[in-house]
């Protein structure tokens, strides 16, 4: 454990721990902005905010202005070491055995991801979930099928689907879709979030682009589009 707050800096030529005392106490966005300005063009930052510093067991690691590695309290692991951030700024090109073949495969993948037929609409969500609930056997689904939903709405695409199929924490997992039926769960339909979404964005090198920024009124003018678990943790879980 470091005696003082530090961050790890690596640019390919050197790897070193640098003092982060001035950053300790800052939130993740403030920290990332400060380290990007210091690291220069091409830098990437993963960092924690006050929750991670205080070893909160729900603290995540933030990157790309608020995208979170949020499972299992990873932010608390960094905080326990007094590691405020990791900053990478590599310049070395990554070698590929067959660059032309890699390019073709990447382009093929991108075309598939960006192909978005109008197969599914927001109001269909509860019916799809109910259909999955009453099926006598569950079928394994190709993960690529989910890209239609994730690309359009993000993870909130599964809100009403998961409620109706029984895969949502209603009443802290003691309840069911009977307690939070379509009439009530309409407030978490994915279209409710798209109505506020003003711009989409991608995490670094991701062709899917499930992220979005939503407009708000009040003290703050915008926020990240919420994720499925956040919405339902503050919804059906609290019943």
Describe every region a protein language model picked out.
Residues 1-239:
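Intrinsically disordered, low-complexity segments enriched in small residues
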């Amino acid at each position: 454990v470091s005696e003082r707050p530090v961050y790890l800096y690596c640019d390919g030529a050197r790897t070193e721990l640098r003092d982060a005392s001035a950053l300790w106490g800052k939130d993740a966005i403030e920290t990332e902005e400060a380290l990007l300005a210091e690291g220069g063009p091409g830098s990437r930052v993963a960092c924690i905010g006050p929750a991670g510093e205080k070893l909160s067991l729900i603290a995540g690691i933030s990157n790309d202005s608020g995208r979170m590695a949020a499972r299992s309290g990873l932010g608390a692991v960094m905080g326990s070491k007094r590691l405020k951030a990791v900053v990478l700024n590599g310049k070395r090109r990554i070698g590929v055995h067959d660059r032309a073949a890699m390019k073709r495969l990447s382009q093929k993948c991108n075309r598939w991801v960006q192909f978005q037929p109008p197969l599914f609409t927001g109001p269909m969500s509860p019916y799809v979930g109910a259909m999955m609930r009453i099926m006598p056997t569950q079928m394994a689904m190709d993960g690529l099928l989910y890209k239609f939903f994730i690309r359009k709405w993000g993870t909130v695409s599964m809100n009403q689907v998961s409620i109706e199929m029984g895969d949502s924490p209603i009443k802290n997992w003691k309840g069911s879709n009977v307690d939070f039926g379509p009439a009530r769960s309409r407030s978490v339909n994915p279209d409710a979030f798209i109505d506020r979404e003003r711009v989409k964005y991608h995490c670094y090198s991701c062709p899917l682009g499930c992220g979005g920024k939503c407009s708000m009124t009040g003290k703050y003018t915008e926020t990240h589009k919420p994720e499925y678990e956040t919405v339902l943790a503050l919804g059906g879980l609290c019943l």
